[in-house]
Amino acid sequence: MSVKEHTKKIMKVFDKNMYYVEMGQGNTILFLHGNPTSSYLWRNIMPYMKEKGRCIAPDLIGMGDSDKLENKSAGTYTFIEHRKWLDELLNLLDIGNRVILVVHDWGSALGFDWAKRNQDRVAGIAYMEGIVRPLKNWDEWPSSSAPIFQGFRSEAGEKLVMEKNIFVEKVLPGSVLRGLTEEEMEVYRRPFNIPEDRRPTLDWPNQIPIEGHPKDVTEITKSYSEY
């Protein structure tokens, strides 16, 4: 299992640089990461798939090596904001039709939503730990992690994430059965070494559609869950 990073390409999207890994040719196989990861998540999978198609794995805006947004306040990196930047990147990359999506975590929500809006362009979807529908209440969330995710929606959560970087330092390695090496952890830490750059990792859990909030994400996830 390799810990080596693949060389990334750069695309100017609106006024920012977004980074992505690309290898292979043919119909697009689109890899979308979640929180708090990056295209690095797919480093050991894409080499096996590059003979099957054009593999593309972007770093979402504000994550991985992609540029950060100027606004550092809460609620900057919403689902809708991520969708805007991802849509434009995919348009610029001309990903074509017969797209296969390989998606994880919030990448699944972005991927499902894109698929719902581009149904005639989708050849297949493979998803892991996906956000497949809105949740009625916290009882539907895994009990082992519900308290901390509820805590992210408080002042204490702001401190835990923005000051202590808990999503990278604790939540991420705690969700990987084999554990992560120090070299792997350094790759995931790098985009969030500066406290103010950690905003995406806190905004994402606050976008989880529970009890009807946020309203727009609840409506979007409900719509694609019926797709």
Regions found by a protein language model. Give the residues of each.
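Flexible "cap/lid" subdomain of the alpha/beta-hydrolase fold that forms the substrate-access gate
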Residues: 2-10, 14-18, 28, 41, ...
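Short beta-strand element of the alpha/beta-hydrolase
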Residues: 27-33
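Conserved residues at beta->alpha junctions
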Residues: 33-36, 192
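A short, Lys/Arg-enriched amphipathic alpha-helix followed by its capping loop at the start of a domain
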Residues: 44-53, 92
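N-terminal cap/lid subdomain of alpha/beta-hydrolase-fold enzymes
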Residues: 47, 58-61
